[in-house]
Amino acid sequence: MQTLVEQIVYISDMFGTAVFAFSGVLVAGRLRMDGFGVMVLAAVTAIGGGTIRDMILGATPVFWVRDPLYIWVVIATALIGMWMVKLPRRMPWYVLPVADAFGLALFTVIGAQKALNFGTSGLIAVLMGTMTGVAGGMIRDVLAREVPMVLQKEIYATACILGGILYTLSLEVGVDRVSAMLISMLGVFGLRVAAIYWHLSLPTFSLQRN
């Protein structure tokens, strides 16, 4: 039987899955894909990172095979998303980025904790948390023939890395798991929202040609 905290994390995980899936729907709509294309981009965005994480860790069957509700959430989000984008009234621009920041924070913590459950080091936990948060979006962008956002100057993967470090260090110094999750999520969410609001970005590397 799940504890209250585990239930809250599970419900939040489903919310994050829906948010990530909806971002895939928006990209597919911008590229004028058919219904199948919408489903594919929604799915890879929402569950791609966690799938790669589970395969690397040897956590098979992967999470959405063990719990098909993730797939149903993706399908429902894709169908609702295709209907919503046709509505005359648009949602405020900041709703999706802020919701995405929450999903990113949660996915980072879930990925890091799952790695720790498999006995990995803190470094690997940080990498797995980051992968859970960003790999799905990278696959989506590659399929859309775009440069993945995490490879540009956006503060996105950096926020995941920060969150993973905060989580593993908090556990290392004796902070309880719930508090460590909150500290990590606040770090990821706060940095990502600050980057959106103040247009913060990382310096870029440019090779000058003579």
Curated annotation (Swiss-Prot):
Domain of life of the source: Bacteria
Pfam families: Gly_transporter
Keyword Membrane: yes
Listed GO CC annotations: plasma membrane
Record keywords, A-Z: Cell membrane, Membrane, Transmembrane, Transmembrane helix
Family to which the UniProt record says this protein belongs: Belongs to the UPF0126 family.
Membrane topology: Multi-pass membrane protein
Membrane-spanning residues: 8-28, 36-56, 68-88, 91-111, 119-139, 155-175
Protein name: UPF0126 membrane protein
Species lineage: Bacteria, Pseudomonadati, Pseudomonadota, Gammaproteobacteria, Aeromonadales
Localization, UniProt: Cell membrane
